[in-house]
Amino acid sequence: MTTREFDYIICGAGSAGNVLATRLTEDPDVTVLLLEAGGPDYRFDFRTQMPAALAYPLQGRRYNWAYETDPEPHMNNRRMECGRGKGLGGSSLINGMCYIRGNALDYDNWSTHKGLEDWTYLDCLPYFRKAETRDVGPNDYHGGDGPVSVTTSKPGVNPLFEAMVEAGVQAGYPRTDDLNGYQQEGFGPMDRTVTPRGRRASTARGYLDQARARPNLEIVTHALADRILFSGKRATGVTFLHGSARVTAHARREVLVCSGAIASPQLLQRSGVGPGEWLRELDIPVVLDLPGVGRNLQDHLEMYIQFECKEPVSLYPALKWWNQPKIGLDWMINGTGLGASNHFEAGGFIRTRDDDLWPNIQYHFLPVAINYNGSNAIEMHGFQAHVGSMRSPSRGRVKLKSRDPNAHPSILFNYMAEALDWREFRDAIRATREIMHQPALDRFRGRELNPGADLKSDNELDAFVRARAETAFHPSCSCKMGYDDMAVVDNEGRVHGIDGLRVVDASIMPIITTGNLNAPTIMIAEKIADKIRKRKPLERSNARYYVANGAPARGGKPARAPAAV
């Protein structure tokens, strides 16, 4: 491949990069080179295409960068997983397919930061709608003709879903019929990025499928970006590794970095943009001393609160190899059955204290007892809640360890570094126990398997969190948007102090959102795509949305009080 020129070069064909590639090439006179370090999203590989197989990609390295943190000092010095997607679709190719946009107040809070006034919820909502096709049709909150297929939960799938939602309501928390609609707060059905044919709705399927045949888009897989090239303070191209060759491509307009919250700061640092002292440690020529690159790293940490199930209604039999051929065949031929769901079909968001302005705890309900990555399956019928805090004050960093593009960076999330983290996790465990002991779950609830009913004191609960809490795989905020001294990009994703260079992915979030990150990342890319194309922003929404405004976290008394559990 000889040196060539394109208008735009996109590094990373993930949740954001595929959106940009598709939208920019809608203009036939614009040429785009899309680089992806992984391979194609093979449509016959059940590991990425079958929703129920979501744990499989995390167990290997074909589709997973399989990063690992440095020893986390507040987590028994454990080196913890940090899985990131590798292949067309990026992390949308291996994620849990939960379609959660975040709380309206996440975006309203962003907009209070200097220069981010056009990132309110009502400014963002039109872009969420633009990206989405929801199976039950559009309304003020949801789209009907976007690239991403969103499937709603249907009643009667598993009695544990309805029982867990009802238990949350019986504990005094709100019920909501749409976690992405008027009111996120409460318990209810969970939307999923799954097609009507029961396939994963990655951005490769939703976006690239409509763009890959365009003559003005070139997609190169197995292309690992090495460095961004500069002329003075202007980005001019990218050098990447493709097989045994080192290839250079030039960008007439811009280089767009969409490599995610780990690899985007890594690429910037390797290219000479980042904290000067870090770059000098590796003898990297400093193009721009930008101290925020790799700082402000955030994630969601979660626990699995697990119970034995007294009735044989869980997914436990589906884990047995002798039942899996039938499940796979039903999915492959009909796009239905257990294989067609990620089985996160209910969940919720609550405030654990009345003075929380919006939900600080998320629930994913699952009708089986197993770790997210498929490990530690409990050998019995069981169910669980994935529970974690949403906006930890702890901050970490991504730091380059080597100039070798194949070397992983040093990653430290610094989980549980603040007193608020510990308070929220203790509150979450106690609130979950109270929910699980409500009458709606009486017929199903057996023994508490994890943490175990005998663990009650603060010290005992803290020890459980240190030993057993895991990542929810939501790294973000490491190239934050804003205008303070630690901001990396402006409100349009443009890197401060550099021309022709943007970062567009979850790394530019100033503060992590309340929930899963795939939907917000797609929205961010849709919004910035209009900025790049110099198009008028979509008209601001006037939809109503819920604000607690001092209302108690629980609107009613629990059906069964804590003293009785």
UniProtKB/Swiss-Prot annotation:
List the InterPro entries hit by this protein, alphabetically.
Answer: BetA, FAD/NAD-bd_sf, GMC_OxRdtase, GMC_OxRdtase_N, GMC_OxRtase_C
UniProt keywords (A-Z) are: FAD, Flavoprotein, NAD, Oxidoreductase
At which positions is FAD bound?
A: 7-36
Cofactors needed by this protein, per the record, are:
FAD
The stretch of residues making up the signal peptide is none
Question: What does the record give as EC number?
Answer: 1.1.99.1, 1.2.1.8
Function per UniProt: Involved in the biosynthesis of the osmoprotectant glycine betaine. Catalyzes the oxidation of choline to betaine aldehyde and betaine aldehyde to glycine betaine at the same rate.
> Which family does the record assign?
Belongs to the GMC oxidoreductase family.
**The protein, known as:** Oxygen-dependent choline dehydrogenase
Q: Which organism is it from?
A: Burkholderia thailandensis (strain ATCC 700388 / DSM 13276 / CCUG 48851 / CIP 106301 / E264)
